């Protein structure tokens, strides 16, 4: 029995090491493989599953589809239904029609994230019916949480709104229902996201009682699971890649957009074409499918989804998302910056080893794959230009001022006690760290040695 138990633990540690090895940060390695480019435009209405461009992260919870798009539902603690794109865009426009989930401490997330941890976020909080949050991170830097902005909106948890992220080499702009809400210029003091990004969406419990106080406050309070189910809706997603080609790669480790190479295409090479595509798709027309040869899916993928007639700018359709990476992180240690995957509580060692870090005077928790959520309350000052919000409503006094993201990785069942979560403590370190992989490997070697003592 002892041998079996140790062997099982050893295998899970090895699995964790291998899982971490699959994630390659181009700023830390010059051997990262190119990522698949979209290189085209499409509109997905999710009337028959996730469609050809998205894939489930296979977390607990349910993702249902129908005439009203997707429903991502948490039925119990540790659920974290979430999905991601099977392509990347290099500058582009993403429109999502969504409705956030109701429920104190429940976070509905939709965001873009790159392999070197640039990130652009849209988040809603189930206990705040008056606001949504825009946020961004640069190269996984979570030393401060002053990039987030809170914006008034009417009924984001009951009504569907169209949220737009327009990302160019010069600025990032968030819009809601046709009105510009916030703009971040490329030369802002906090830095600028400029590397190929995938799309993530999901719902998770930031208010799980095992999370750190800062995370719970940010999410809006302790989650009451007796009020489940919690459901976020996503009716449609329109994506237009501003670059062309079959795949994107990093030519050096600078992380600048000028270092990105487009195989068979050009960075920013289809901006004008994308604008035409967007107009057609929003008006219910199809777009030229010739670009779809650049898509990671079969050439028919774009033609099938782009022919969908739903207008992504319509505020009447639902849409919702999640932290990739955002899976619910019931333990603040299980949350990781928007890379979407995970459940509300602490995962077992078979999933990943989480690293506790400190940034300034705030303790944060990150995973090796992404940024982190705040673990102690902090005041944020939104950078960038904020416009008057569409459908303004009184701001909720209960809204937290801590702004940040989420996410965690892993599939295994969470441990029952926060004290059981594996962690390694470091200081003055932010962004994705590779300690998890090293920790898992050392643990594996130690266990193997123990077996033969």
Swiss-Prot record:
CDD domains: GH16_fungal_CRH1_transglycosylase (cd02183). Its main location: secreted. GO terms for biological process: carbohydrate metabolic process; chitin metabolic process; fungal-type cell wall organization. Induction: Expressed in cell walls of both yeast and hyphae cells. Up-regulated by growth in hypoxic conditions, during cell wall regeneration, by heat stress, as well as by calcineurin, caspofungin, and fluconazole. Expression is also regulated by CAS5, RLM1, and SPF1. A lipid is attached at residue 430 (GPI-anchor amidated asparagine). Residues 281-343, 362-397, 410-430 are annotated as: Disordered. This is Crh-like protein CRH11. The active site is at residues 119, 123. It catalyses: Random endo-hydrolysis of N-acetyl-beta-D-glucosaminide (1->4)-beta-linkages in chitin and chitodextrins. Its EC number is 3.2.1.14, 2.4.-.-. It holds the Pfam family Glyco_hydro_16. Residues 1-21 form the signal peptide. GO terms for cellular component: cell surface; extracellular region; extracellular vesicle; fungal-type cell wall; hyphal cell wall; plasma membrane; side of membrane; yeast-form cell wall. It comes from Candida albicans (strain SC5314 / ATCC MYA-2876). Disulfide bonds join 24-32. GO terms for molecular function: glycosyltransferase activity; hydrolase activity, hydrolyzing O-glycosyl compounds. It is a lipid-anchor; GPI-anchor. Residues 28-227 form the GH16 domain. Belongs to the glycosyl hydrolase 16 family. CRH1 subfamily.
């Amino acid at each position: 029995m002892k041998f079996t138990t140790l062997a099982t633990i050893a295998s899970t540690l090895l699995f964790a090491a291998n899982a971490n090895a699959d994630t390659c940060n181009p700023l830390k390695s010059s051997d990262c493989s190119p990522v698949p480019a979209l290189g085209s435009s499409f509109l997905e209405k999710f009337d028959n599953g996730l469609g050809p461009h998205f894939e489930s992260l296979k977390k607990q919870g349910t993702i249902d589809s129908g005439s009203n798009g997707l429903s991502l539902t948490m039925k119990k603690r540790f659920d974290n239904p979430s999905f991601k794109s099977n392509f990347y865009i290099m500058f582009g426009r993403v429109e999502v029609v969504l409705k956030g989930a109701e429920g104190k401490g429940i976070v509905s997330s939709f965001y873009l994230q790159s392999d070197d941890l640039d990130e652009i976020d849209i988040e809603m909080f189930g206990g705040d019916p008056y606001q949504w949050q825009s946020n961004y991170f640069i190269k996984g830097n979570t030393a401060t949480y002053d990039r987030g902005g809170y914006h008034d909106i009417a009924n984001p948890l009951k009504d569907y709104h169209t949220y737009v992220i327009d990302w160019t080499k010069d600025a990032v702009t968030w819009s809601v229902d046709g009105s510009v809400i916030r703009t971040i210029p490329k030369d802002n003091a906090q830095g600028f996201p400029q590397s190929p990004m995938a799309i993530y969406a999901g719902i998770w419990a930031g208010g799980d009682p095992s999370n750190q106080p800062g995370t719970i406050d940010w999410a809006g309070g302790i989650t009451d699971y007796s009020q489940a189910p919690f459901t976020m809706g996503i009716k449609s997603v329109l994506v237009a890649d501003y670059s062309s080609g079959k795949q994107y790669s990093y030519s050096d480790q600078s992380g600048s957009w000028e270092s990105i190479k487009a195989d068979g295409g050009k960075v920013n090479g289809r901006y004008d074409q994308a604008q035409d595509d967007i107009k057609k798709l929003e008006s219910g027309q199809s777009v030229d499918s010739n670009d779809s040869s650049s898509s990671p899916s079969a050439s028919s993928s774009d033609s099938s989804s782009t022919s969908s007639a739903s207008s992504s700018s319509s505020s009447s359709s639902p849409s919702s998302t999640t932290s990739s990476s955002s899976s619910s992180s019931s333990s603040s240690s299980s949350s990781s910056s928007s890379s979407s995957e995970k459940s509300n509580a602490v995962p077992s060692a078979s999933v990943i080893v989480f690293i506790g870090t400190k940034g300034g005077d705030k303790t944060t928790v990150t995973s090796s794959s992404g940024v982190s959520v705040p673990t102690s309350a902090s005041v944020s000052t939104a950078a960038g230009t904020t416009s008057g919000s569409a459908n303004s409503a009184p701001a909720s006094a209960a809204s937290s001022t801590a702004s940040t993201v989420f996410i965690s990785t892993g599939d295994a069942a969470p441990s029952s006690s926060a004290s059981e979560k594996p962690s390694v403590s470091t200081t003055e370190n932010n962004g994705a760290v590779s300690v998890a992989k090293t920790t898992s490997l050392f643990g594996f070697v130690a266990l193997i040695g123990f077996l033969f003592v």
